[in-house]
C-alpha cells in the first residue's frame, strides 16, 4: 500500500512544538518519524507562523511542501486518508465530527469535554458513518502503564479491586502567559479538566466499555488560590491579571464507581508548585503496582510489613519480560522522539490499524466514557459534590464487547 496521506489540524505547542524550547518535536515530529507509513500533505492552523513552522519541518524531513489552510473544512476536501486533530480542547469534537461525516478516519488528541451531549454526538456519528476514530491517549502506550496492564493480564495481580491516578503538572506559567487555551478553561470552569492521561490506562485495565462500565462519580474541588498567588508574585502578569478570578480549584479529586465493584480515584493538581506525576497505582488481590516508586509488590515475594516497603522501590525492571514487544524493541532515537517513546509507538499502531483496516485501539465508546468525566465532575462539584450517574455510551453493548488492549492490534 502507498503511504497514507495525512491532514494535520492544529499546529501549536502540542501539534508542532510551536514556541517550545525544551527540544520537543510535537505530534508532527512523531508522525514524521513514522515516515515509512505516511506523508503529511495538508496542514491547518489559525496562525500563519504555526503553518510556516510545520511546513519547514515537513520539507526538512524530505517531503514536498504541504498545502496550507486556516480553515479546517478545507482539509476535508484535500484527498487525504486520515486526519490528526491537535487543536484546542474546545475544537476537538466539532472537527472530528466533520471528518467522520466526510468519511475520513480521525485521530483526535486527548482532553475532556464540558458537554456529555458532545460525547453522544461522537458515538452517534460513528454508528451512522462507521468512520474510524482513534482517541490519542498516548499514556496507554507508555512503558509503565504497559507493564502494569501486562501484569494484570498475566494474572500476577489477581483480581483488580482499585486503581488510582493523577494529572499532577505545574502549568501555572502556561496559564498566566496565555500561550494556549488553558487560561480561559481555568477562568471559566471548575472540574476534572484533563482526566484521560491517568484514567485511560485504568479504564483499559478495568475493561471499561467491554464487560464493565463507570456507573457514577463524585468530585470535590479545593479552593482556587495557586494561580492568584502566582500571578500577584510575578511582575510580568500582576498588573494585567491581578484581579482575574479563576473558577478552577487547585486540586480536584474524583471517585468513580464501576459496575463490577471496582473503584477509581483521580486527582487533578496543576496550579500549585510540584513535580510532574501521573501516579498510577493498581491494587489487586495478589499484587500492587505503584508508578511513582516504580514498584511491583506480589504476594509471597515481599514481607508486606511496612518496614520492608522500600525494598520494592524501583524494582519494576525485574519484570521487563512482561513488557509488550514494542517496548523490548524500541530504539534510543524513538525514545527521544517524544514523551519517552509512547508517542512514536502510538502513531505506529494507529497507522498500522489504518493500513490493515483493523479496529481502533482506543475507540469512540472509550473516548466518550473517558472524556465525559470532565462534564460529569463539573456537574458534581457545582451541585455540592453529589454523586452523578455516568452514561452508558455503548447502549448496552459493553456486556458483550471484547477487551482490546492497545498492544493487541
Predicted segments, located by residue:
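Conserved acidic residues
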Residues: 41, 66, 81
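Predominantly a Rossmann-like dinucleotide-binding segment in NAD(P)-dependent oxidoreductases
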Residues: 10-15, 129-134, 139-246
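Short acidic low-complexity segments
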Residues: 66-78
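C-terminal helical cap and adjacent loop that interface with cofactors, partners, or active-site loops
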Residues: 273-284, 288-409
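Glycine-rich phosphate/pyrophosphate-binding beta-alpha loops
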Residues: 263-276
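N-terminal Rossmann-like dinucleotide-binding module
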Residues: 1-61
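Beta-strand-loop-alpha-helix segment that lines the small-molecule cofactor/substrate pocket
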Residues: 81-82, 88-141, 155
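Conserved short alpha-helix immediately C-terminal to the canonical SAM/SAH-binding motif I
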Residues: 49-50, 91, 144
Amino acid at each position: 500500500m502507498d503511504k497514507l496521506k495525512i491532514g494535520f489540524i492544529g499546529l501549536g505547542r502540542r501539534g508542532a512544538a510551536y514556541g517550545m524550547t525544551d527540544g520537543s518535536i510535537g505530534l508532527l515530529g512523531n508522525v514524521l518519524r513514522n515516515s515509512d507509513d505516511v506523508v503529511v500533505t495538508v496542514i491547518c492552523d489559525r496562525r500563519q507562523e504555526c503553518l510556516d513552522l510545520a511546513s519547514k519541518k515537513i520539507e526538512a524531513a524530505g517531503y514536498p511542501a504541504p498545502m496550507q489552510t486556516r480553515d479546517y473544512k478545507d482539509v476535508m476536501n484535500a484527498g487525504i486518508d486520515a486526519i490528526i486533530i491537535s487543536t484546542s480542547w474546545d475544537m476537538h469534537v466539532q472537527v472530528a465530527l466533520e471528518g467522520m461525516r466526510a468519511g475520513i478516519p480521525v485521530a483526535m488528541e486527548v482532553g475532556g469535554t464540558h458537554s456529555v451531549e458532545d460525547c453522544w454526538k461522537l458515538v452517534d456519528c460513528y454508528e451512522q458513518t462507521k468512520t474510524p476514530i482513534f482517541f490519542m491517549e498516548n499514556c496507554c502506550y507508555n512503558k509503565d502503564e504497559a507493564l502494569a496492564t501486562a501484569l494484570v493480564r498475566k494474572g500476577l495481580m489477581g483480581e483488580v479491586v482499585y486503581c488510582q491516578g493523577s494529572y499532577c503538572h505545574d502549568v501555572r506559567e502556561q496559564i498566566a502567559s496565555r500561550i494556549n487555551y488553558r487560561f480561559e478553561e481555568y477562568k471559566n470552569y471548575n472540574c476534572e479538566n484533563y482526566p484521560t492521561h491517568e484514567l485511560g490506562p485504568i479504564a483499559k485495565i478495568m475493561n471499561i466499555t467491554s464487560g464493565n462500565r463507570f456507573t457514577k462519580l463524585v468530585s470535590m474541588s479545593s479552593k482556587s488560590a495557586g494561580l492568584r498567588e502566582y500571578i500577584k508574585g510575578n511582575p510580568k502578569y500582576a498588573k494585567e491579571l491581578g484581579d482575574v478570578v479563576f473558577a478552577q480549584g487547585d486540586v480536584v479529586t474524583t471517585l468513580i464507581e464501576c459496575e463490577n465493584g471496582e473503584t477509581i480515584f483521580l486527582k487533578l493538581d496543576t496550579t500549585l508548585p510540584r513535580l510532574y506525576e501521573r501516579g498510577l497505582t493498581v491494587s489487586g488481590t495478589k499484587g500492587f503496582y505503584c508508578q511513582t516508586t516504580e514498584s511491583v509488590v506480589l504476594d509471597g515475594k515481599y514481607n508486606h510489613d511496612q518496614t520492608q516497603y522500600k525494598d520494592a522501590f524501583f524494582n519494576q525492571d525485574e519484570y521487563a519480560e512482561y513488557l509488550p514487544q514494542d517496548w523490548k524493541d524500541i530504539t534510543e532515537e524513538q525514545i527521544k522522539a517524544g514523551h519517552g517513546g509512547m508517542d512514536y509507538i502510538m502513531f505506529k499502531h494507529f497507522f498500522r490499524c489504518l493500513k490493515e483496516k483493523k479496529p481502533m485501539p482506543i475507540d469512540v465508546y472509550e473516548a466518550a466514557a473517558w472524556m465525559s468525566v470532565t462534564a460529569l465532575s463539573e456537574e458534581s462539584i457545582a451541585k455540592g459534590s453529589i454523586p452523578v450517574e455516568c452514561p452508558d455510551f455503548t447502549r448496552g453493548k459493553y456486556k458483550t464487547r471484547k477487551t482490546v488492549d492497545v498492544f493487541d492490534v
